[in-house]
Amino acid sequence: MCIGKVTSSWRSAASIILACKTTRRVLMLKRGTTAKFMPNTMVFPGGVVDKTDAKLGDEFRIAAVRELFEESGVLSTKNGWQTSANNPDMTSLKADIVNDTSKFEQLSGTICADNLIEWDTFITPANYPRRFLTKFYLMLVDDEPAIDLCTSEMSEYNWIEPKECVDEAYAGKYALPPPQVYELTRLSQVKDWDLCEKYGNVKKPICPQPIKTIGENLITNCFPGDYMYIDENSLQQPLRQMSADRVTVDPTQPTHRATYYSEPMYGKVRLYQHLLKPADIAAFHQFDTHSKDLL
């Protein structure tokens, strides 16, 4: 049974996973309580593409670089990176850019977006009132830059190993949205981060199709390739409701999904990926998930 309305349009957005090869840790930010989208959740730096971003290059890549600078003070440059931490001039410019994104053009001769690795694309489920098509990029660095946090948008930051972040969220320490769990789990299983480019999901976006379990606060997000994923009009599917026996993970069927509890927010996210068809195996990075507990 389908319930609720569908939001047919979305805005373009970009997110960046800042990953240190030496420590194998990534930068995570916690959204503030007043954030319009996913408040009080741990996320990667990122935000909406601005109309001025296209003036400097690929609008998604430029937006990723700009948002990283706005939220963390870390700037991707042609020589690696710079940080506004303990740099009054850069701190002042960062504040100006937060208030007026067009001022990012002042850094056009300094910034570099070509070094970003295209990692994945997620589209917000159709039942959400605010939808985004978000391109995720990976930026690899040799050392962890000092962070100059934008406290008007974020409440805290943390350098943390990907698996540790996922485990702490599962234990209830903080809320971690399913896309972040998906990307961190993938990244944690890449042994050599210098080879990350070969694991990017660049062929097909992931638009989760949510199913609510009747009588429970359990949500199932079906991804492309899952046997319950609806391919026709796949980006505009409304929320469905099903009994527990219908939506329970089947170890004998092609499966690509995330499950979580809506209370507490994004509680105990579990990923499943098994028995995908060849075309979906080619389209999506294959990695270990909770499916190993079933097979």
Curated annotation (Swiss-Prot):
Signal peptide coordinates: none
Pfam families: NUDIX
Cofactor(s) the protein needs: Mg(2+); Mn(2+)
Nudix hydrolase domain sequence ranges: 9-182
An MF annotation (GO) of this entry: hydrolase activity, acting on acid anhydrides, in phosphorus-containing anhydrides
Keywords of this entry: Hydrolase, Magnesium, Manganese, Metal-binding
Transmembrane feature ranges: none
InterPro entries: NUDIX_hydrolase-like_dom_sf, NUDIX_hydrolase_dom, NUDT19
Enzyme Commission number: 3.6.1.-
Keyword Hydrolase: yes
Residues noted as binding Mg(2+) in the record, renumbered to the chain: 67, 71
First-level EC class: hydrolase
Motif residue range(s): Nudix box: 52-73
Summary of the function given for this chain in its UniProt record: Probably mediates the hydrolysis of some nucleoside diphosphate derivatives.
Similarity comment: Belongs to the Nudix hydrolase family.
The protein's name in its UniProt record: Putative nudix hydrolase 7
